[in-house]
């Protein structure tokens, strides 16, 4: 596809999340608490990709993601590319990378885990598998997969 064949129009300022696993963009919008009454969003679902076969793309006009949102995004779309757009120019392109350990982003799905008590303890998970994502709680060793993670957002 050439640049003249864009399926979704360019945005002036904001964020573009590209290379999302096909049919996962709605989970990301839910995590970002979008749509809302003020933010223009463009979503392409299950479009052709030379690298991935099929992918999703999200364009968010007038908003850049917070670090907290990026930390959650990497769990839902670890292979995604995050682009910051200003005055129609891509000023920063970041390839998301899932670290070997995740801290204070999600909660253990085990209701008896110490992290779900009133104790002031850090929520820590080892990344057992990056694709598909599997996390293991540092304290109780409960494993969590994509659906367990996504349901928290």
UniProtKB/Swiss-Prot annotation:
Cofactor field: Zn(2+)
One function term, GO molecular function aspect: metal ion binding
Binding residue positions for Zn(2+): 108, 113, 137, 140
Superkingdom in the source lineage: Archaea
Cofactor: how and how many bound: Binds 1 zinc ion per subunit.
Keywords carried by this UniProt record: Metal-binding, Pyrimidine biosynthesis, Zinc
GO biological process, one term: pyrimidine nucleotide biosynthetic process
Keyword match Metal-binding: yes
InterPro entries in alphabetical order: Asp_carbamoyltransf_reg_N, Asp_carbamoylTrfase_reg, Asp_carbamoyltrfase_reg_C, Asp_carbatrfase_reg_C_sf, Asp_carbatrfase_reg_N_sf
GO cellular component, one term: aspartate carbamoyltransferase complex
Disulfide bonds: none
Membership in a protein family: Belongs to the PyrI family.
Record's subunit section: Contains catalytic and regulatory chains.
Function, as annotated: Involved in allosteric regulation of aspartate carbamoyltransferase.
Protein name: Aspartate carbamoyltransferase regulatory chain
